[in-house]
A protein has these predicted regions:
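NTP-dependent small-molecule kinase module
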Residues: 2-4, 146, 164-223
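Conserved phosphate-donor/acceptor-positioning beta-strand/loop module used by diverse small-molecule
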Residues: 105-110, 119-143, 174-177
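Post-Walker A helix-loop "phosphate-sensing" segment adjacent to the P-loop in P-loop NTPases
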Residues: 34-42
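Post-Walker A alpha-helix
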Residues: 28-29
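ATP-dependent small-molecule kinase phosphotransfer cores
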Residues: 46-105, 112-115
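Extreme N-terminal, non-catalytic leader segments
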Residues: 1-15
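P-loop (Walker A) phosphate-binding loop of NTP-binding proteins
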Residues: 18-20
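Conserved lysine of the Walker
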Residues: 25
């Protein structure tokens, strides 16, 4: 479907994007929604405080922990997870709205949430996004300018573990060039995909990244 074309047909599958922090899944998600009218971004709920540039309802639905827990206990979340000390979740209403409009819901969530969605949303497509190198990942994390070195190191350690979960996803995309990564994810969304993007075929790339992260951490986080 071309940009700005008609909406996706009824039953358009949801697209679940997961990645280590700094791999670029949010940039890919935003590009899909900005370019194609048949995509709807799923705004997550979170207990994390808003950053200076973030807007309620656009980046996240920011809420207190008691309100989040009440929503979860009422069965109003498709998935939820605690990440880096904060709770994140996907409101059921996001998927309902997308299905009513015949749109692909684009979910930008962590690997814990993706696992829960796998059990609940049978027609969703799951994509794991990788950085092109461990050095690039470190650079992106540091380039945010909002995290202390110890936080970046913790995220790098978490990234190494999250990459192990990539084999549970349908496809793996390496975000070495944003436009190309967006094109690959779009192809996956509409079912026009290269077999080489299957997770099982990317095992060598995943293992190389993990090994290099191990090296960086053992060198005292000096990348």
């Amino acid at each position: 479907m071309s940009p700005n074309g008609p909406g996706a047909p009824a039953g358009a599958p949801a697209l679940v994007l997961s990645a280590p922090s700094g791999a670029g899944k949010t940039s890919i998600s935003k590009a899909l929604v900005q370019t194609w009218d048949d995509c709807l971004f799923s705004v997550s709920a979170t207990t994390r405080p808003a950053r200076e540039h973030e807007t309620e309802g656009l980046h996240y639905h920011f809420m207190s922990e008691p309100d989040f827990v009440a929503m979860r206990d009422a069965g109003q979340l498709l998935e939820w997870a605690e990440v880096h000390g904060h709770m994140y979740g996907t409101p059921q209403s996001n998927l309902d709205a997308a299905r009513q409009r015949g749109l692909h819901l684009i979910l930008d969530i962590d690997v814990q949430g993706a696992k829960q969605l796998r059990a609940k949303v049978s027609d969703a497509v799951f994509v794991f996004v990788l950085p092109p190198s461990a050095e690039t990942l470190v650079g992106r994390l540091r380039g945010r300018g909002t995290e202390a070195d110890e936080v970046v190191e913790r995220r790098l350690r978490n990234a190494r573990g999250e990459m192990e979960q990539a084999f549970d996803f349908d496809y793996v995309v390496v975000n070495d060039d944003l436009d190309r990564a967006v094109a690959e994810v779009r192809a996956i969304t509409v079912g026009n995909v290269e077999f080489s993007l299957r997770a099982v075929d990317m095992s060598g790339t995943i293992r190389q990244l993990q090994t290099r992260i191990d090296d960086i951490l053992s060198e005292g986080f000096s990348a």
